Amino acid sequence: MENIDPKDIQELIDRTRIYDVLTRYCRALDRCDVDLMRSVYWDDARDDHGVFNGGAQEFAEFIIREIQQWFEVTMHAIMNVHMELDDKTACTESYLFAYHKVRGDREKVEEIFGSKYLSQFDWSKVDGIPHVFYYGGRYVDRLEKREGEWKIAHRQVVMDWNHNEISSGIFDEGMFKTLTLRGARGHSDPVFKNLID
């Protein structure tokens, strides 16, 4: 049997812990959990997110407030994650796919999407109908390991593409009416009933 270098084992542990930080961020966004969001960043971390550029702890409060104000539901997922790391620092590029459902009032839709998007609709027919946008991009992060714990020290968000349209979501007809367990923000989401304390 081949001898396994303890450094290789430690690298696997570090990669797993870094990935956990990245996925906790997505959960924090979609469950609107400010405390969980803060927990993925160091106190002196920065987030350059486009709509916000500054201290990451302040960003946590800002982004959760914005999500609650503008969106009925969001879902963020990371896919391919490329990591380069040493003992104390990691640089990651995480491919991102996100879904956002925007409340259908004209003012909100215009603020999110802009007047060019708005002009393509007869608002007498679509007023009140939610709109959605799909977003593809990347989180480019520098994480640091301090006292054995990995957290984000700096995050940049890169947008690669987006797609926007009127929502065609169905919840009360066909097979969808039988799917009665629904996601929710905060601790009323079904996942919290299954968590191990």
Where do the protein language model's features map onto the residues?
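A solvent-exposed, acidic/Ser-Thr-rich amphipathic alpha-helical stretch
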Residues: V34-L118
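Short beta-strand or tight-loop elements
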Residues: H76-M79, Y135-Y139
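Short beta-strand edge/turn micro-motifs at domain boundaries
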Residues: C91-E93, S124-D127, G136-E173
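Transmembrane beta-barrel outer-membrane domains
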Residues: T16, E72-T74, V132-Y134
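A hydrophobic membrane-anchoring alpha-helix module
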Residues: V157-N164, G169-D197
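Short, low-complexity N-terminal intrinsically disordered segments enriched in polar/charged residues
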Residues: M1-R27, R31, S39
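Short beta-strand segments enriched in hydrophobic/aromatic residues
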Residues: L29, Y41, L96-A98, Q156-M159
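Mixed-charge, low-complexity intrinsically disordered segments
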Residues: K101-V132, L181-G186
